UniProtKB/Swiss-Prot annotation:
Chain ranges passing through the membrane: 1-21, 42-62, 67-87, 111-131, 147-167, 185-205
Keyword Nuclease: no
Gene: argO
Name listed for the protein in its UniProt record: Arginine exporter protein ArgO
Native organism: Yersinia pestis
Reactions it catalyzes: L-arginine(in) = L-arginine(out)
Record keywords, A-Z: Amino-acid transport, Cell inner membrane, Cell membrane, Membrane, Transmembrane, Transmembrane helix, Transport
InterPro entries: Arg_export_ArgO_enterobac (IPR023445), LeuE-type (IPR001123), Lys/arg_exporter (IPR004777)
Gene Ontology cellular-component terms listed: plasma membrane
Membrane topology (UniProt): Multi-pass membrane protein
Record's subcellular location: Cell inner membrane
Gene Ontology terms for molecular function: amino acid transmembrane transporter activity; L-arginine transmembrane transporter activity
Note, other: In Yersinia pestis biovar Mediaevails str. 91001, the CDS has been disrupted by IS100 element.
Entry function: Involved in the export of arginine. Important to control the intracellular level of arginine and the correct balance between arginine and lysine.
């Protein structure tokens, strides 16, 4: 059982660690110390749903529906381009972190919607959870499959909370105007690059 658990943990960690929209968003919220634990919780919860759905039979849905995959892909391209452009404009204007209570309250809902879009409009999430984890987990015997899923889920929870807390700890250094401008440029570049990659996949290049 432990070997199966560790297999799920290591495989899930290997897919989560590369830089992607979720990681960039959680890191940025941690640096701002703006609902970063909520962001980590929502990312982890979304991963739990997707991982369990993929391992326990949902992978067939994506593999049998090219139209669904295309819709998710192009929806992701549009969203990432919009989000990346916003980050680049913030870098250009030198926008800082809003400090008023009203802005923070409004920001909570905007963060929620943006985070759900970053997660659920990202085709790579479905490929990782449904195709990779789903195909490998589906080959296991039913009595040990939950251990594989538990390992994969644990890796996701540990990673997102560690990322959010580490970014928040480093925020006194990373939340300065110059650092924020660099981070916004970095976020905009990453989002644009991922959108370009998704567009190439959508065109079949």
């Amino acid at each position: 059982m432990l070997a199966v658990y560790l297999h799920g943990f290591i495989l899930s960690a290997a897919m989560i660690l590369p830089l992607g929209p979720q990681n960039v968003f959680v890191m940025n919220q941690g640096i701002k110390r703006q609902h970063h634990l909520m962001s980590a919780s929502l990312c982890a919860l979304s991963d739990i749903i997707l991982i369990c759905a993929g391992i326990f039979g949902g992978s067939a849905l994506l593999s049998r529906s090219p139209l669904l995959l295309a819709l998710v892909t192009w929806g992701g391209v549009a969203f990432l381009m919009w989000y990346g452009w916003g980050a680049l404009m913030a870098a250009w204007r030198g926008d800082g972190v809003a400090s008023s209570a009203t802005s923070v309250t409004q920001g909570r809902w905007r963060i929620l919607v943006t985070l759900l879009a970053v997660t659920w409009l990202n085709p790579h999430v479905y490929l990782d959870t449904f195709v990779v984890l789903g195909s490998l987990g589906g080959q296991l015997l039913p009595d040990i499959r939950p251990w594989f899923a538990l390992g994969a889920v644990t890796a996701s929870i540990v990673w997102f909370f560690a990322l959010a807390l580490l970014a928040a700890w480093l925020s006194p250094w990373l939340n300065r105007p110059v650092a924020q401008r660099i981070i916004n440029l970095f976020v905009g570049g990453v989002m644009g690059f991922i959108a370009f990659q998704l567009a190439r996949q959508g065109f079949g290049l």
